[in-house]
């Protein structure tokens, strides 16, 4: 399939190509090449990341334009994942964290996204779906506390100083290897298939950190766990639009 994935400056304000007024310093003038690509190409889906104070109209302007030129397109919004910046006061150490903290943060994010998606669903039935990366990351936190991620040494490098952490900073950028989990969640949602069914070796690039150099890749065991977590997150989130009633790893 052919997919339109927004770069971060477009994610910050999804309707930026339709508005000439700058609202953030990161935004340049509208990029007509994106509208041209949509209007002249054949596309299957558009994907976004969320941002603060999102509104349905920020997305509907894109959806309307896309459906005008590609009526069969579907639309996907990643729900990102919990961030320590949501906590007030911020944690002083990982002793202040536990699974329940992340479950609570995830539910707070879900509530906001649910309202947004339901509003869009009323206008575009069965067209808008959530990519539940947040749910998957909470499941990863659960696996960590259960001792199922022995290669991972902490929850957040910002608190622990450990290189191999689930997150690497207060904002919530992923730790080494967890981009695979994010990718598997995207795959599972869009293709409605469990990543466990992916055959053969995936030629992942090695992780090179600007300060730390080449980092260890996730083991095959950790990679397989990521695939299972991704599918579990997707089929258990009703906003993903993916069901697996017979549990064969193929969306119904």
What positions do the PLM features span?
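Well-ordered, non-membrane alpha-helical segments in soluble/globular domains
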Residues: 28-32, 55-62, 99-117
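Extracellular serine-dependent O-acyl
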Residues: 111-164, 183-194
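Conserved SGNH/GDSL esterase-like catalytic core that processes O-acyl groups on lipids
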Residues: 1-65
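Structural recognition of the beta-strand scaffold that forms the well-ordered cores
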Residues: 44-49, 74-79, 129-132
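Solvent-exposed loop/turn segments at secondary-structure junctions
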Residues: 2-5, 50-56, 80-85, 135-139, ...
